[in-house]
Amino acid sequence: MAHKKGLGSSKNGRDSNAQRLGVKVFGGQLVPGGSIIVRQRGTKIKPGNNVGWGKDDTLFAKVTGVVEFRDRGRMGKFVNINASV
């Protein structure tokens, strides 16, 4: 058995925090304006009507309304907000 720790062992033992990405609000839910809908890296889901696009690719509601996800085939997946009256 070794009586010393070894060269690499004391340099190990770190881990980064989770980034907490993903869909935060699902289809059919009512959201207030300004709330985050999706946190993502890249444009996995694209912004549609009444949805804003943050500099870190976060999608957020511009107006109060109901969330709707649509898959438009080759064009990709989109999220829309159907504004409530």
From Swiss-Prot:
Pfam families xrefs: Ribosomal_L27 (PF01016)
Gene3D superfamilies in the cross-refs: 2.40.50.100
Entry GO MF terms: structural constituent of ribosome
SUPFAM superfamilies given in the database record: Ribosomal L27 protein-like
Domain of life: Bacteria
Coiled-coil intervals, chain numbering: none
Record-stated family: Belongs to the bacterial ribosomal protein bL27 family.
NCBIfam families: L27 (TIGR00062)
PANTHER family the record matches: LARGE RIBOSOMAL SUBUNIT PROTEIN BL27M, RIBOSOMAL PROTEIN L27
Name of the molecule in the record: Large ribosomal subunit protein bL27
Organism lineage: Bacteria, Pseudomonadati, Acidobacteriota, Terriglobia, Bryobacterales
Gene: rpmA
